[in-house]
């Protein structure tokens, strides 16, 4: 593997970052007080810090990437991310507040998301899945972002719960811009693309069959719609389909037409729903892929099956449409936004989501912490330890 020199990598990235036009924060390292490390990533070359923006006292996240250790391929990858971050401007896409070079590190500054990611929520509070209305609000925000991305001529290629971030005011943001791929070549929009996502091991369960096949037929924006369907199952069931399955078996399952489903009274046999929860298993719609259910209290005396619930026919149909094996049979993001599944939405996400996410408490209210006294930060760090920040791609 060839590596750029420190000067070469910094100069290459700087051509993108020093002309930051989207920045609402100053692109200077001295303006940010790094408080604590909350994650690592990008082949261990990236450190994620909680930081305080000194001019306003606002808490932000700062991704610092060691450019001196990056290969040529990694630098090109990062350049693509920065280009997309400047190109995109949408209320449901995570905005980059500043990007700049400091001491041979690429710094990427974004607002701190007080509710974390949707994956954090299902891992820490909604282990058996979220309620349907909350999912509707979240997926509506994701589809609005995807509709914009697709109209801009890009494929996202990394839609999953950990790339859906929720702010303090209940707004939904799609992140993971690093994996976006342009379908424009020489000024013309291509019908399909063939590039396989780099550094994609963690996203394999969400990828569509046509992306995994890596054949001459290629794939297009409809591959993101498949990922939306998988993400819907992830949010509703509390786990992602195909989890822990070997890549080759996963590919075979998808190519053979195995379609995951929502786990409820319409998809789980009645005899399983009446079993003792410790003995019952719920088939997620995948052959040989069983998920052991866990006891939950019911009326204070006997445990009930965690999936003894019924999602609406509209939600089931929505997921079925997204997971059509034939990409041409999947609706576009704009078409899905008009699906009956979203008719249950009556308010803005910013008004409804904080209520629907109770008893989750957003990580916030540390304004009283002074620059020399970070006692309030210790509580924040404790809460952050529960979040899977490594998976956040801001």
Swiss-Prot record:
Region (Disordered): 273-306
Subcellular location as annotated: Nucleus; Cytoplasm
GO cellular component, one term: serine/threonine protein kinase complex
Domain (Protein kinase) ranges: 32-342
Gene Ontology terms: biological process: activation of protein kinase activity; protein export from nucleus
UniProt-listed InterPro entries: Kinase-like_dom_sf (IPR011009), Prot_kinase_dom (IPR000719), STRAD_A/B-like (IPR047173)
Residue ranges, compositional bias (Polar residues): 275-302
Keyword Cell division: no
Source taxon at top rank: Eukaryota
Pfam families, per database record: Pkinase
Key words, A-Z: Cell cycle, Cytoplasm, Nucleus, Phosphoprotein
Gene3D superfamilies, alphabetized: Phosphorylase Kinase, domain 1 (3.30.200.20), Transferase(Phosphotransferase) domain 1 (1.10.510.10)
Functional summary from the UniProt entry: Pseudokinase which, in complex with CAB39/MO25 (CAB39/MO25alpha or CAB39L/MO25beta), binds to and activates STK11/LKB1. Adopts a closed conformation typical of active protein kinases and binds STK11/LKB1 as a pseudosubstrate, promoting conformational change of STK11/LKB1 in an active conformation.
Family: Belongs to the protein kinase superfamily. STE Ser/Thr protein kinase family. STE20 subfamily.
Protein name: STE20-related kinase adapter protein alpha
Organism field: Macaca fascicularis (Crab-eating macaque)
């Amino acid at each position: 593997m060839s590596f750029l020199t420190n000067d070469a990598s910094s100069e290459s990235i700087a051509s993108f970052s020093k002309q930051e036009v989207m920045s609402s924060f100053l692109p200077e390292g001295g303006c940010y007080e790094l408080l604590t490390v909350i994650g690592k990533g990008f082949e261990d070359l990236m450190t994620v810090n909680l930081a305080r923006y000194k001019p306003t006292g606002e808490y932000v996240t700062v991704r610092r990437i060691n450019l001196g250790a990056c290969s040529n391929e990694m630098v090109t990858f990062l350049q693509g991310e920065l280009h997309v971050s400047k190109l995109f401007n949408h209320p449901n896409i995570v905005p980059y507040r500043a990007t700049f070079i400091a001491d041979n590190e690429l710094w990427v500054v974004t607002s701190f998301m007080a509710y974390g990611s949707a994956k954090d929520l299902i891992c820490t509070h909604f282990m058996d899945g979220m309620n349907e209305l909350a999912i509707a609000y979240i997926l509506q925000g994701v589809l609005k972002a995807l509709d914009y991305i697709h109209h801009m001529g890009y494929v996202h290629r990394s839609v999953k719960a950990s790339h859906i971030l929720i702010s303090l005011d209940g707004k939904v943001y799609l992140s993971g811009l690093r994996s976006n791929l342009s379908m424009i070549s020489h000024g013309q929009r291509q019908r399909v693309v063939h590039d396989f996502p780099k550094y994609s091991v963690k996203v394999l369960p969400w990828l569509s069959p046509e992306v995994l096949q890596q054949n001459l037929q290629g794939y297009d924006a409809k591959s993101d719609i498949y990922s939306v369907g998988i993400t819907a199952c992830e949010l509703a069931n509390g786990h992602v389909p195909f989890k822990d399955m070997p890549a080759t078996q996963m590919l075979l399952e998808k190519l053979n037409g195995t379609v995951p489903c929502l786990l409820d009274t319409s998809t789980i046999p009645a005899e399983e729903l009446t079993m003792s929860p410790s003995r019952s298993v719920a088939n997620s719609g995948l052959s040989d892929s069983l998920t052991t259910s866990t006891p939950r209290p019911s009326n204070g005396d006997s445990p009930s099956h965690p999936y003894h619930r019924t999602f609406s026919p509209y939600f089931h149909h929505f997921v079925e449409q997204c997971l059509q094996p034939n990409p041409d049979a999947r609706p576009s993001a704009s078409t899905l936004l008009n699906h009956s599944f979203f008719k249950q939405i009556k308010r803005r996400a910013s008004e409804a989501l904080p209520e629907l996410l109770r008893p989750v408490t957003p990580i916030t209210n540390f304004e009283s912490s002074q620059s020399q006294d970070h006692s309030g930060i210790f509580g924040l760090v404790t809460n952050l330890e529960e979040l899977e920040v490594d998976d956040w791609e801001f």
